[in-house]
Amino acid sequence: MQRLEESLHEAPIIDKDGYSYLVHPISNGVPMLDPQLLREVVVGITRAADLDVDKIVAPEAMGIHIATALSLQTDVPLVVIRKREYGLDGEVALHQTTGYSESEMFINDIEDGDRVLVVDDLLSTGGTLAAICGALDDIGAEVSDIVVAIRKVGETALDDTDYEATSLVDISVDEDGVEIH
């Protein structure tokens, strides 16, 4: 994960109400995302993840580019958990609470018995992933694996579930920059 680690060290840190916020191509789409960095992340996920799945699941918005590239690499169909309701048959709503927001998200095209791989850009508070896994459980899907590109060290809402996420790199962030763990 040489490119990923180097890019994390180079990423700008901005202060948002006393919170040191990492601005990174994988987690924010800015600065520009180098295709070699995205490729490195996808190769890392293919090595780390259980790919014996029916579908790849990713939350809107910043999980989409990673999951799309992974879907193309593996030929596993992609389901995006969206922030907008369409009212389609079988649509399931979930409520997510993160460290900085609360919102509804919506799942389509997941059925009882589906084996899924959940992919996301960043695990920080864990609120999004915990809500997604709970909703997938309620549907009857089996979450075979959860893989994130970047994990901020510390407690998360995922810790209160039966799920564990694998990360390609673990970091901490403060006003001085990023530390790789």
From Swiss-Prot:
- Enumerate the Gene Ontology biological process terms: purine ribonucleoside salvage
**Entry's PROSITE patterns?**
PUR_PYR_PR_TRANSFER
User: InterPro entries per the record?
Assistant: HGPRTase-like, PRibTrfase_dom, PRTase-like, Pur/Pyrimidine_PRTase
Q: Which UniProt keywords apply?
A: Purine salvage, Transferase
Enzyme Commission (EC) number: 2.4.2.-
Reading the lineage from the top rank, the first entry is Archaea
Q: Name one GO molecular function term.
A: transferase activity
Q: Which family does it belong to?
A: Belongs to the purine/pyrimidine phosphoribosyltransferase family. Archaeal HPRT subfamily.
What job does this protein perform?
A: May catalyze a purine salvage reaction, the substrate is unknown.
Q: What is this protein called?
A: HGPRTase-like protein 2
